[in-house]
Curated annotation (Swiss-Prot), chain A:
Residues with the O-(pantetheine 4'-phosphoryl)serine modification: S37
Source organism per UniProt: Bacillus subtilis (strain 168)
Record PTM text: 4'-phosphopantetheine is transferred from CoA to a specific serine of apo-ACP by AcpS. This modification is essential for activity because fatty acids are bound in thioester linkage to the sulfhydryl of the prosthetic group.
Gene name, Swiss-Prot/TrEMBL: acpA
Gene3D superfamilies: ACP-like (1.10.1200.10)
GO biological process, one term: lipid A biosynthetic process
Entry function: Carrier of the growing fatty acid chain in fatty acid biosynthesis.
Signal peptide: none
Keywords tagged on the record: Cytoplasm, Fatty acid biosynthesis, Fatty acid metabolism, Lipid biosynthesis, Lipid metabolism, Phosphopantetheine, Phosphoprotein
Domain of life from the UniProt record: Bacteria
High-level lineage: Bacteria, Bacillati, Bacillota, Bacilli, Bacillales
Record protein name field: Acyl carrier protein
One family name in Pfam for this protein: PP-binding
Pathway: Lipid metabolism; fatty acid biosynthesis
Curated annotation (Swiss-Prot), chain B:
Name of encoding gene: fabHA
Domain of life where this protein originates: Bacteria
Region listing for ACP-binding, in residue ranges: 238-242
Any one Gene Ontology molecular-function term assigned to this protein's record: beta-ketodecanoyl-[acyl-carrier-protein] synthase activity
Protein known as: Beta-ketoacyl-[acyl-carrier-protein] synthase III 1
Gene Ontology cellular-component terms listed: cytoplasm
The keyword Protein biosynthesis belongs to this UniProt entry's keyword annotation: no
Species, as recorded: Bacillus subtilis (strain 168)
Location within or outside the cell: Cytoplasm
Entries under InterPro entries matching the protein: ACP_syn_III_C, ACP_syn_III_N, FabH, Thiolase-like
Catalytic activity of the protein: (2S)-2-methylbutanoyl-CoA + malonyl-[ACP] + H(+) = (4S)-4-methyl-3-oxohexanoyl-[ACP] + CO2 + CoA; 2-methylpropanoyl-CoA + malonyl-[ACP] + H(+) = 4-methyl-3-oxopentanoyl-[ACP] + CO2 + CoA; 3-methylbutanoyl-CoA + malonyl-[ACP] + H(+) = 5-methyl-3-oxohexanoyl-[ACP] + CO2 + CoA; malonyl-[ACP] + acetyl-CoA + H(+) = 3-oxobutanoyl-[ACP] + CO2 + CoA
Family: Belongs to the thiolase-like superfamily. FabH family.
């Protein structure tokens, strides 16, 4: 968990230019972290590369918060 | 024998359609369009102006800059998905209008990657010693295949033409490497429907484009025996600033080394790369001896890239 969250957090901080402190599990990409739809697509792509997995469109649409992303990745591994 | 680009030209329709104009046509906003696409305005050809008219204008400019007479053209390749009609082809129409009597002529259909396909095809005929002068035109009247009631696509496209004369250059100039590719399994993500409207799955196309543009750039640089630091300028297909930025980041190039015309013209498909090339040359951004990478992707799915050392 810690490791996944750490790697996910780093990607979010790099891509969205937000403070690490704001990347909480309950934070919504669009509402709290200022991401638009394309930012979310880019984030998903980076997660795919980082964790060597494919995230389908259908699944990607359900990823709204940092916690959703972390849970999704852990369930796939 | 090395093939290179001897001269370039472009044609841009006069009529400007701004994001604010679009706000009155579909439910959208200037702010939304700018942040998602980088587009501020696009050009729309008049009702009685077709691809052949724009192609001829761009071709004449290219021939003049190349100092090549139309009668000396051996081949005309026109990349377009919006020909005046299926046949005669736009290439045959402009062969007549230019008076390029000697030239064979055919249209190339590879969507937004069409200009790259054309340049690479021309290069083969030059380097084999078969032909001396190949005119390659990228031209689109995308306004004619846009659903002006679909806010997802109506904001993206524009009309225009760009042309290049491909011919023999000195051994230390010209096209260094290329890559062409296709993936028909992705055809469903970007296509023309039965109503002749462009349909796009934005998310899928975005993902494909971001990955493919970066990949193709890296591949042509490697094939040319160069490294990223050797690249002086990048001309990506002007589809969407966010996709272009991803390619630029992959090459680790500063902002000023990437061509950006998408804000003025939107996505002009096969025309976008040659139009940008003309503008960057005019602005003095590309100089003799510079290594320039051009890369495009489009419906098909198709993609193509070249690395070229600029000059004759």
């Amino acid at each position: 968990m810690a490791d996944t969250l750490e790697r996910v957090t780093k990607i979010i901080v790099d891509r969205l230019g937000v403070d690490e402190a704001d990347v909480k599990l309950e934070a919504s990409f669009k509402e709290d972290l200022g991401a638009d739809s394309l930012d979310v697509v880019e984030l998903v792509m980076e997660l795919e590369d980082e964790f060597d997995m494919e995230i389908s469109d259908e699944d990607a649409e359900k990823i709204a918060t940092v916690g959703d992303a972390v849970n999704y990745i852990q369930n796939q591994q | 024998m090395k093939a290179g680009i001897l001269g370039v030209g472009r044609y841009i329709p006069e009529k400007v359609l701004t994001n604010h104009d679009l706000e009155k046509m579909v439910e959208t906003s200037d702010e939304w369009i700018r942040t998602r696409t980088g587009i501020e305005e696009r050009r729309i050809a008049a009702d009685d102006v077709f691809s052949s008219h724009m192609a001829v204008a761009a071709a004449k400019n290219a021939l003049e800059q190349a100092e090549v007479a139309a009668e000396d053209l051996d081949m005309i390749l026109v990349a377009t998905v919006t020909p005046d009609q299926s046949f005669p082809t736009v290439s045959c129409m402009i062969q007549e209008q230019l008076g390029a009597k000697k030239a064979c002529a055919m249209d190339i259909s590879a969507a937004c990657a069409g200009f790259m396909y054309g340049v690479v095809t021309g290069k083969q005929f030059i380097e084999s010693g078969t032909y001396k002068h190949v005119l390659v035109v990228g031209v689109e009247k995308l306004s004619s295949i846009t659903d002006w009631e679909d806010r997802n696509t109506a904001v993206l496209f524009g009309d225009g033409a760009g042309a290049a004369v491909v011919g023999p250059v000195s051994d230390d100039r010209g096209i260094l490497s290329f890559e062409l590719g296709a993936d028909g399994t992705g055809g469903q993500h970007l296509y023309l429907n039965e109503k002749r409207h462009t349909i796009m799955n934005g998310r899928e196309v975005f993902k494909f484009a971001v990955r493919q543009m970066g990949e193709s750039c890296v591949n042509v640089i490697e094939k040319a025996g160069l490294s990223k630091e050797d690249v002086d300028f990048l001309i990506p297909h002007q589809a969407n600033i966010r996709i272009m930025e991803a390619a630029r980041e992959r090459l680790e190039l500063p902002v000023e080394k990437m061509s950006k015309t998408v804000h003025k013209y939107g996505n002009t498909s096969a025309a976008s790369i040659p139009i940008s090339l003309v503008e960057e040359l005019e602005a003095g951004k590309i100089k003799d001896g510079d290594v320039v990478v051009m890369v495009g992707f489009g419906g098909g799915l198709t993609w193509g890239a070249i690395a070229i050392r600029w000059g004759r």
